[in-house]
UniProtKB/Swiss-Prot annotation:
This is Mini-ribonuclease 3. Its cofactor is Mg(2+). It is an enzyme of class 3 (hydrolase). The active site is at residue 19. Belongs to the MrnC RNase family. One of its GO terms (cellular component) is cytoplasm. It comes from Symbiobacterium thermophilum (strain DSM 24528 / JCM 14929 / IAM 14863 / T).
Length: 130
């Protein structure tokens, strides 16, 4: 999809979309690796999608992000109104929101190749054991 200027959207809207896109990417990746039982899919997906994992991914990716991508991450990380669940560390949850905002932004900006690079790097990072 391509939106004229996804930067005009609220960062939490970008993160909302990015969350769904990343979750779908992870599920597809797990299916490709032979996981077909729902319980196995769910258990393995948690390694990729928990706030702790996404915060670690973001920390790993930040040096490789462009200035504009880092700005999107900052907007997502600093957005108000995304209170962390009681079980999550607020800083990690904010960082994971920044990662999700980046994913949503890249998708809406029509940057499919860059989105694929970011998602692949994220999954590879988790699979290497962080």
């Amino acid at each position: 999809m391509r939106l004229a200027n996804p930067l005009t959207l609220p960062p939490l809207t970008l993160a909302y979309l990015g969350d769904a896109l990343y979750e779908a990417f992870v599920r597809e990746r797990l299916l490709e690796r032979g996981y077909v039982r729902v319980n196995d899919l769910h258990r393995h997906a948690l390694r990729y999608v928990q706030a702790t994992a996404q915060a670690a991914i973001l920390h790993h990716l930040m040096p490789a992000l462009t200035e504009q991508e880092q700005d999107v991450v900052r907007r997502g990380r600093n957005a108000k109104g995304h209170g962390a669940p009681k079980s999550a560390d607020p800083a990690e949850y904010a960082a994971s929101t920044g990662f999700e905002a980046l994913v949503g932004y890249l998708y809406l900006a029509g940057q499919a190749e860059r989105l694929s690079e970011v998602l692949q790097a994220a999954a590879d990072f988790i699979e290497r054991g962080q």
